[in-house]
Amino acid sequence: MLLASTTSAVPRTLSPPTPAGNGSRELLDTRDPLLVQAELALLSTVFVAVALSNGLVLGALARRVRRGRWAPMHVFIGHLCLADLAVALFQVLPQLAWDATDRFRGPDALCRAVKYLQMVGMYASSYMILAMTLDRHRAICRPMLAYRHGGGARWNRPVLVAWAFSLILSLPQLFIFAQRDVGNGSGVLDCWAHFAEPWGLRAYVTWIALMVFVAPALGIAACQVLIFREIHSSLVPGPAERAGGCRGGHRTGSPSEGARVSAAMAKTVRMTLVIVIVYVLCWAPFFLVQLWAAWDPQAPLEGAPFVLLMLLASLNSCTNPWIYAFFSSSVSSELRSLFCWARSRAPPSLGPQEESCATASSFLAKDTSS
C-alpha cells in the first residue's frame, strides 16, 4: 500500500510522503519556516494574478455583451476565464489555507471535494484552450460546419465537451483522496491519497501528465499548424494548395484581399508561437518535477526549488487571459476603455489621460467583430 502526502495543490497530492514522526507535535513541526513563507508568498502572488487578470478580461467581455457585440471567439475567452477563475478559487486559495495550517482542516467530505475541484480546474483550463483552438481550426478550414453547429452560441458544443471531460476525468480524485492518519496511530489526520499498489502513484501521475499537458499540447500545436497551412495555401494558386492541409478554405482574388490574408497569417503565426511556447513553459516544469517525484525514490522532495516548482500548476492561468486579449483587438480595446473609465472616476488630472481614453474609444469603434 502507498500513501501519498497532500500538502500542496496537485503536486504533493500526487507525491510520496515525507517520513512522519511518532507524535503529532513532531509531525506539525517538520517544515522549514523560510520555505513555508516562500510557498505562501508564491501562492498569494499567483492567486492575485489569476483572479485579477481573468476578472479584468471577464469585465471587458461583459461590456461587449451589454452592447450586443458578442462574437464567437468571446465565448471561448469567457469560458477560459471562468476555468482559470476556478483554478484560483478552488485550487490556489484552498492550497494557500492548507499550507498556512500545514494539515488539512476539515471533514472527509470537504477533503474529497477540494481535491476534486482542484483537478477540475486544471483539466478545464487546458481543455478550454484546446476547444478554442479546435473551433478556430473549424472556422477557418471548414467554415460551413462552424455556422451549422452554432459557433456563436454562448454554450456551444466544444465548450460543453471541455467542461464535461473536465468533470468526468477528475472523478478519481473523489476515491483516491480522503482524511487519513498520517502516522502509525499518531491521531493526526491529513488529506492523503491512497494507492493499493506501489505502481499506482506512478501510473496516476503519468496519466495526469498525459491528459492535462501532453495530449492538449499536441492537439493545440497540430490545429495551429493546420490553420497556418490553410491560410498559407489560400495565397498559393494551384491544385496542390490543399495537399496535406484541411478543406473548405477559399482563395483570395484581389491584392487587397491577399494583403488581409497575409496580415491574418502573420497574426496566426505569432499567436501559434506564443500559445504553444507559453503553454509548454508554464506546464513543463510542474509536470517534470511531478514525474521525477513519482518515478525516482531519491528525488529531492524537500529541496526548495523542487517544492516551489510543485506549486506552479496554475501558472498558465495567469498568462491565458492576456494572450488571447492581446490577439483579440476587440477585447484589448475594451480593456483600454475599462481602464479609462476607472481613471475617469478618479480626480481630474492632465490632458493626456483624456487623449488616451479618446484613442481607446476610437479603437473600439473601429473593431466590433473580432
Curated annotation (Swiss-Prot):
Coiled coil: none annotated. Signal peptide: none annotated. Disulfide bonds: none annotated. The keyword Amino-acid biosynthesis does not apply. Pfam families: 7tm_1. Glycans are attached at N22. One of its GO terms (biological process) is G protein-coupled receptor signaling pathway. It comes from the Eukaryota. Residues 63-76, 135-158, 220-270, 328-370 are cytoplasmic. It is found in: Cell membrane. Residues 1-37, 98-112, 180-199, 293-307 are extracellular. Residues 1-26 are annotated as: Disordered. GO terms for cellular component: plasma membrane. It is a multi-pass membrane protein. Belongs to the G-protein coupled receptor 1 family. Vasopressin/oxytocin receptor subfamily. This is Vasopressin V2 receptor. It comes from Canis lupus familiaris (Dog). The gene is AVPR2.
